[in-house]
Amino acid sequence: MAELAEQKREEYKAHAPVFHRPKDGAREVHEPYLAALVEDGDNVTLVHEAADGHVDAFLVAMLFPAPPVYDPGGSTCSVDDFVVESPELWETAGRALLERAFAATRQRGAVQSVVVCGPQDEPKRTLLRSMGHDVASEWFTLPFGQPAVT
């Protein structure tokens, strides 16, 4: 899982180099963080294995209550750590992981999902749109002290 996440960080760094700049030793810090997510029974952690047995995709879903000013009717399934080894796996492994995570979190009271996806990650965005997701919010970043790109 940590290796796949590291690959995704490198990919995302090209799009937003300050926001996604990996810290020195990021993998060593991320491994225990991922382990804690896996061990937390409140989370839904799923992996997909390739035919040779190596992990080629993973997902961690967490349940969160809505902010106090909103009432969607239940909790939110938040999916931030969600990575596949190669773009063509989004439609197969990625879809399978999301479907399982959504089923598990709906049983726990989730009424909606929020899936983090970078604007440049078109294969992942295509999967999410094909499953009925819509963009509800976006983050715009500006590194201070550096010229804005227009």
Task: Kindly label every feature range from the protein language model.
Residues 9-33:
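Conserved GNAT-fold acetyl-CoA-binding loop/helix
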Residues 105-117:
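Conserved GNAT acetyl-CoA-binding A-motif
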Residues 31-47, 78:
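A short helix-loop-beta-strand connector motif used in the catalytic cores of GNAT acetyltransferases and
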Residues 66, 116-118, 129, 134-147:
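Conserved catalytic-core motifs of GNAT/GCN5-like acyltransferases
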Residues 95, 99, 107, 119-137:
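Conserved active-site alpha-helix within GNAT-family acetyltransferase domains
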Residues 81-84, 90-103, 130:
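Conserved acetyl-CoA-binding loop-helix of GNAT-fold acetyltransferases
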Residues 47, 54-63:
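Conserved beta-strand in the GNAT
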Residues 62, 72-86, 138-141:
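Conserved acetyl-CoA binding element of GNAT-fold acetyltransferases
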